[in-house]
C-alpha cells in the first residue's frame, strides 16, 4: 500500500464497528492517527471491540453521544449505514468536521488501478463477473473484489500490489463520503429510484451515484448503460471517456444485436449462452465485457467465463434440478423492480413464482404486467394477500399460500410438472420472517436439497 502521512497524529473518529469500521480503525491506527471508535451497540455485543482496545484504540459504545464531538476530532470516518440525519452526524456537519467513508481511505492507499462499480441493481453480479473475467486471462496481478460486496475496501487495498486490479462494488451510501477517490474505470449499471428514505430525494440519490466519476479525467473510462436517457444526458457532464453498453441499439461499446453480444462490431458470444437468465443479466454482462476488453481479456476467455458463470448467491442463482424441475434462488429481489427483472428471464407459462415478505405499505399493481401468464404463484409472509390481489389482476388461475419459504417450495413442487421452473423472487424484504435475504435464500436452497434427498 502507499505509505501516506496524511493522518499522522490526527484525531479521527470512526463511527460504526461493522467490518468496514474495524478495518478503517486499524488502518488509521497504523498510519499514526489518534483513533476513537464509536458504536451504538454495547461493548459486549461488539466482538471486535476488545481487539481494538488491545491495539490501543479507544472504544466508546452504547450510543452516539454528541458530547464526543467536543474532543475536536479533525475527521470522521462514517459507516455508510449510519444516516446523515443521525444527531451526532448532523452536529458534525454543523461544526464542519469532514466526513468520509472507508472507501475513500482505500482509494488513498491503493497502489493499483481501481475499477469501481455502482448502480441501483446489478452491482454485485457485475462486480463478480468483472472479477472472474480479469482473473481468467491475466499475465500478472490479480483482480481483488472489495467494497459493498462484503470485503472491507481498506483491508483489500492494503493487500493489493501495484500489478493487481482493485474491483470495488460501491453503494450510494459509500459514494456520499468520497473526496479524492479516483477509479481508472467506473461502471454505472443503471439508475432507478431507491433509498429515498436515506437520500431525501431522487436528485440527491442520483448525485451520490454520479459522484463515482467526479475525480476522473480524460485518461479514465466511464462505462454507462445507454438504455437510460438519464445516463446519456449525464454523460455530457463528465470529463472521463464514455464507453456505452446497450441492449436496444448498436453503440460504440458493447451491445446486443440479433441475440448476439458484440463489442465495437466484434462478435463476442450468443446471448443465450450466458450462464444466468434475464435481460438484466445481459446488461450486466455487457458492462463486464466493456471492462474485460479495456483490460485486454480475450474473446475466448470472455465467452468461456460468462458461459460458466452460474450467478451470485441469492441473485437469480441456479440451485439445481429435481425430477426435471429447475430451481432458482433470487432472494435478493427485495423490491418490485428486482422481481420484474428476474421474471423477464423466464417463460411464464412454465414458471411458478414464490413471493412475499415484509409489508412496507405499498401495493403491487406495478408488478401485474410481469405476472401475466404465470403458471402459478405461491405466496407467503405479510404481503401475501396484497400479492394475491395483484395475481388476480394478472389473471393467474392458480394462487397458492404457504406459511414460509420452506413450505412454499414443497407446495410449488407438488403442483409443478416436468420442465417447469420454480423461482424464489419475493419482491419484498425478508424481515417479517427472516433476519436477512441471505437466510431466506438459504432456507429455499435447503428445502430444494431436501427434495433432492427424498428422491434418492
Curated annotation (Swiss-Prot):
Reactions catalysed, as given in the entry:
UDP-N-acetyl-alpha-D-muramoyl-L-alanine + D-glutamate + ATP = UDP-N-acetyl-alpha-D-muramoyl-L-alanyl-D-glutamate + ADP + phosphate + H(+)
A single Gene Ontology MF term assigned here is: UDP-N-acetylmuramoylalanine-D-glutamate ligase activity
Q: Supply the Gene3D superfamilies for this chain.
A: Mur ligase, C-terminal domain, Mur-like, catalytic domain, NAD(P)-binding Rossmann-like Domain
Q: Where is this protein found?
A: Cytoplasm
Q: What class of enzyme is it?
A: ligase
EC number(s)? 6.3.2.9
Q: Does the keyword Cell cycle apply?
A: yes
Give the keywords, sorted. ATP-binding, Cell cycle, Cell division, Cell shape, Cell wall biogenesis/degradation, Cytoplasm, Ligase, Nucleotide-binding, Peptidoglycan synthesis
- Record's family? Belongs to the MurCDEF family.
Q: What are the transmembrane regions?
A: none
Q: Cross-referenced InterPro entries, in alphabetical order?
A: Mur-like_cat_sf, Mur_ligase_C, Mur_ligase_C_dom_sf, Mur_ligase_cen, MurD
Q: What is this protein called?
A: UDP-N-acetylmuramoylalanine--D-glutamate ligase
Amino acid at each position: 500500500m502507499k505509505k501516506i502521512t496524511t493522518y499522522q497524529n490526527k484525531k479521527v473518529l470512526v463511527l460504526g464497528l461493522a467490518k468496514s469500521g474495524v478495518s478503517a480503525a486499524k488502518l488509521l491506527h497504523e498510519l499514526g492517527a489518534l483513533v476513537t471508535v464509536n458504536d451504538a451497540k454495547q461493548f459486549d455485543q461488539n466482538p471486535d471491540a476488545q481487539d481494538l482496545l488491545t491495539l490501543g484504540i479507544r472504544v466508546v459504545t452504547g450510543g452516539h453521544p454528541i458530547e464526543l464531538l467536543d474532543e475536536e476530532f479533525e475527521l470522521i470516518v462514517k459507516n455508510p449505514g449510519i444516516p446523515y440525519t443521525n444527531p451526532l452526524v448532523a452536529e458534525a456537519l454543523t461544526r464542519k468536521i469532514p466526513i468520509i467513508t472507508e472507501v475513500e481511505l482505500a482509494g488513498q492507499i491503493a497502489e493499483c488501478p481501481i475499477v469501481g462499480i455502482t448502480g441501483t441493481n446489478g452491482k454485485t453480479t457485475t462486480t463478480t463477473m468483472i472479477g472472474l473475467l480479469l482473473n481468467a486471462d491475466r499475465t500478472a496481478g490479480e483482480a481483488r473484489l472489495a467494497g459493498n460486496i462484503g470485503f472491507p475496501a481498506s483491508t483489500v487495498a492494503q493487500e493489493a500490489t501495484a500489478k493487481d486490479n482493485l474491483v470495488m462494488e460501491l453503494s450510494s451510501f459509500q459514494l456520499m463520503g468520497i473526496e479524492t477517490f479516483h477509479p481508472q474505470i467506473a461502471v454505472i449499471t443503471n439508475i432507478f429510484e431507491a433509498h429515498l428514505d436515506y437520500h431525501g430525494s431522487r436528485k440527491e440519490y442520483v448525485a451520490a451515484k454520479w459522484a463515482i466519476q467526479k475525480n476522473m479525467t480524460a485518461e479514465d473510462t466511464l462505462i454507462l448503460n445507454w438504455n437510460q436517457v438519464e445516463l446519456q444526458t449525464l454523460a455530457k457532464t463528465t470529463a472521463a471517456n464514455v464507453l456505452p453498453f446497450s441492449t436496444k441499439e448498436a453503440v460504440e461499446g458493447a451491445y446486443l444485436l440479433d441475440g448476439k453480444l458484440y463489442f465495437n462490431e466484434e462478435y463476442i458470444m450468443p446471448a443465450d449462452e450466458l450462464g444466468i437468465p434475464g435481460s438484466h443479466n445481459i446488461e450486466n454482462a455487457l458492462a463486464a465485457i466493456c471492462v474485460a476488453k479495456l483490460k485486454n481479456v480475450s474473446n475466448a476467455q470472455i465467452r468461456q467465463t460468462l458461459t460458466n458463470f452460474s450467478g451470485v448467491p441469492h441473485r437469480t442463482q441456479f440451485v439445481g434440478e429435481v425430477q426435471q424441475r429447475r430451481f432458482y434462488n433470487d432472494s435478493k429481489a427485495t423490491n418490485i423492480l428486482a422481481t420484474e427483472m428476474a421474471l423477464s428471464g423466464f417463460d411464464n407459462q412454465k414458471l411458478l413464482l414464490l413471493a412475499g415478505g415484509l409489508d412496507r405499505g405499498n401495493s403491487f399493481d406495478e408488478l401485474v404486467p410481469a405476472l401475466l401468464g404465470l403458471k402459478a404463484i405461491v405466496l407467503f409472509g405479510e404481503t401475501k394477500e396484497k400479492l394475491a390481489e395483484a395475481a388476480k389482476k394478472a389473471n393467474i388461475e392458480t394462487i397458492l399460500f404457504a406459511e414460509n419459504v420452506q413450505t412454499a417450495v414443497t407446495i410449488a413442487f407438488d403442483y409443478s410438472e416436468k420442465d417447469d421452473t420454480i423461482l424464489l423472487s419475493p419482491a419484498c424484504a425478508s424481515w417479517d420472517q427472516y433476519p436477512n435475504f441471505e437466510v431466506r435464500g438459504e432456507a429455499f436452497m435447503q428445502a430444494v436439497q431436501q427434495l433432492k434427498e427424498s428422491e434418492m
